[in-house]
Amino acid sequence: MTDTNKMIINLAVFGRTQSGKSSAGNVLLGSADFYSSFAPGSVTKECSLGRSCHLHGFMRRGGQEISLQIQVLDTPGYPHSKLSTRCVKQEVKKALLHHFGQEGLHLALLVQRADVPFFGQEASNAVQLMQELLGDSCKNYMAVLFTHAEELEEAGLSEEEYLREASDTLLTLLDSVQHRYIFLSGRGNLCNEQRIKILERIMEFIKENHFQVLSLA
């Protein structure tokens, strides 16, 4: 297979402490690259890059089958229970430039627990961090990934019903990112079927941007 038949997709996950960033990254990769555990404080203290195996024939482009590889940058939660604001910003900025400085970023995922209300300053902190590090145009390359989506099913809510009850803060954010969002269930985290559906959704977002990347240089 030639290089023209291969595509590398660069993703980064951001969000509050215990939002499920590392677990979501593992689902995207299809492997347990990132350490994830329940804890009363922040678990991830430094950025880490994970790479998936090649997904052969995942999509077609120009009449040819394309082999896809996913790269995910896991970032510390923000605000962080152990690291200062300055340390988190420096760590994430350094990692973004190191890993994606030449190739650019296809999509930045704001990870938000579906069972935690999104409003107030704490909810806005991660969004502000993303804008500060990625620039004013970052919302053109941003999507919201809701974790713990199994809570919707237990509450008898569809995704549409959930969003109708969402806070104005969340609805405004979704409007600003052209309603790019994904729901991720915690049941069977590494389930390949769920992973493929999420990757297909992500590729839809990337196609909407005509495969352009957010420049970090």
Swiss-Prot record:
Domain of life of the organism encoding this protein: Eukaryota
Family named by the database record: Belongs to the TRAFAC class TrmE-Era-EngA-EngB-Septin-like GTPase superfamily. AIG1/Toc34/Toc159-like paraseptin GTPase family. IAN subfamily.
List the top taxonomic levels of the source.
Answer: Eukaryota, Metazoa, Chordata, Craniata, Vertebrata
Q: Which PROSITE patterns does the entry link to?
A: G_AIG1
**Record-linked InterPro entries:** G_AIG1, GIMA/IAN/Toc, P-loop_NTPase
Its source organism is Mus musculus
Arranged from A to Z, the UniProt key words for this protein are: GTP-binding, Nucleotide-binding
Task: List, in alphabetical order, the Gene Ontology terms for molecular function in this entry.
Answer: GTP binding
Has keyword Protease?
no
Output this protein's name.
Answer: GTPase IMAP family member GIMD1
Is Nucleotide-binding there in the keyword field? yes
Q: Where is the AIG1-type G domain?
A: 6-217
Pfam families for this protein: AIG1
Positions annotated to bind GTP: 15-23, 36, 148-150
